[in-house]
Regions:
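Conserved class I S-adenosyl-L-methionine
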Residues: 4-71, 76-85, 177
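Class I SAM-dependent methyltransferase SAM/SAH-binding core
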Residues: 86-130
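A short acidic, Gly/Pro-enriched loop at the edge of an enzyme's catalytic core
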Residues: 132-140
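A short glycine-rich, Lys/Arg-flanked "PGG" loop and its adjoining helix->strand segment in the class I
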Residues: 155-165
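Core SAM-dependent methyltransferase catalytic element
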Residues: 199-219
Length: 219
């Protein structure tokens, strides 16, 4: 027999799913709108520890999945982590990569990440839309950041020339951000290698996909 607490949890989950379905249908008839956030807003939020919840246990699955893809497909390679924040993904990647470079537009977030810098791990303040990596990489990761760009497809395409041969792009997006339009555009432009949908018991869910930089359909 279902307990009251479990019934409430299930009701919450179904409500989230219904709300997401409505959002996705409405999105099909609306122009794409990115989440425009200024650097100082990011800095203020990180100073106020407003993003600390990203380190909660219910956020772990997407980080672990990205790390798993890199461990399986590009072990011992170089990683560019776009929008790295305080470097939570880097912690999951420790021991997997040869070189890691995390970039973020927030100075404050990188203050928290930089204590983990070493000879193979670096963090830089940069605008991802125009950043030029100092070396070619095996994998570029966009972990919950692509919907902050006004032109997300151009940003992904920007990094093509900085990927090594058979390099990969790994993208994670949370469903509450209604990224349907972005996923559709990516599938039309880039070659899919693999993908998975992750759902936590709280109702949070993400899609993580791996694209390859090779092929005529990569713009």
């Amino acid at each position: 027999m279902m307990t009251v607490s479990r019934w409430i949890d299930e009701l919450k989950r179904q409500t989230i799913q219904a709300d997401r379905w409505v959002r996705q249908r409405l999105e099909q008839f609306q122009p794409y709108r990115h989440y425009a956030v200024q650097p100082e807003t990011w800095n203020s939020q990180y100073r106020g520890l407003e993003w600390d919840w990203l380190n909660d246990l219910d956020e772990l699955s997407r980080y672990a999945m990205i790390a798993g893809y890199i461990r399986r497909l590009k072990p011992g390679g170089s990683v560019l982590d776009v929008g790295c924040g305080v470097g939570l993904l880097q912690q999951q990647l420790a021991g997997i990569y040869k070189r890691y470079l995390g970039i973020d537009i927030s100075v404050e977030s990188l203050k928290m990440a930089r204590p983990r810098q070493d000879a193979s791990t670096h963090f830089l303040v940069a605008d991802a839309a125009t950043f030029v990596p100092p070396y070619a990489v095996d994998t570029v990761v966009f972990n919950e950041c692509l919907y902050y760009f006004e032109h997300p497809f151009e940003v992904v395409a920007h990094y093509r020339s900085f990927l090594k041969r058979q390099g990969l792009v790994i993208i994670s997006m949370y469903h509450e951000t209604t990224p349907t339009r972005i996923w559709t555009g990516l599938s039309q432009r880039f070659r899919l290698v693999d993908g998975i949908r992750l759902e936590h018991l709280t109702g949070k869910d993400w899609t993580v996909k791996v694209f390859t930089a090779t092929g005529d359909n990569f713009v």
